[in-house]
UniProtKB/Swiss-Prot annotation:
GO CC field: membrane
Protein name in the entry: Protein virB3
Organism: Rhizobium radiobacter
The keyword Acyltransferase appears for this protein: no
Ranges that cross the membrane: 22-42
Entry membrane topology: Single-pass membrane protein
Family, as annotated: Belongs to the virB3 family.
First and last residue of the signal peptide: none
Function: VirB proteins are suggested to act at the bacterial surface and there play an important role in directing T-DNA transfer to plant cells.
Chief localization: membrane
Alphabetic keyword roster: Crown gall tumor, Membrane, Plasmid, Transmembrane, Transmembrane helix
Disulfide-bond pairs as recorded: none
Localization terms from the record: Membrane
Amino acid sequence: MNDRLEEATLYLAATRPALFLGVPLTLAGLFMMFAGFVIVIVQNPLYEVVLAPLWFGARLIVERDYNAASVVLLFLRTAGRSIDSAVWGGATVSPNPIRVPPRGRGMV
C-alpha cells in the first residue's frame, strides 16, 4: 500500500477565466450591454466615457484576483436577490416563487 501519488502540473492559465482587455468575459459582456443601453437611451455616445473608469477599475481588481468578478456575480445571484433574509436570518436560495401562479404549484 505504498503507492506514489501521481503528480500533474496545473498551469495558471487553466485556473483563471478568459479575459478580454484585462477583464473577464462575463464582466466585459455586461459592460458592452450597458454601453449599448446607454447609446439607445441617451442617443449620445459621448456618455460612454463613464464606461472607461468602470472598465479600468474592474481591470485593477481583476489583476489582484481573477475570480473577483465571479464572486460578485455569485453574490448578486444569491444574497443580492434574497428577499426572505429577514425571515430566515440570512440569504437562502428559496425554491418557492415570489408569486404563486393561479393554478397552484403544478398540482392540478
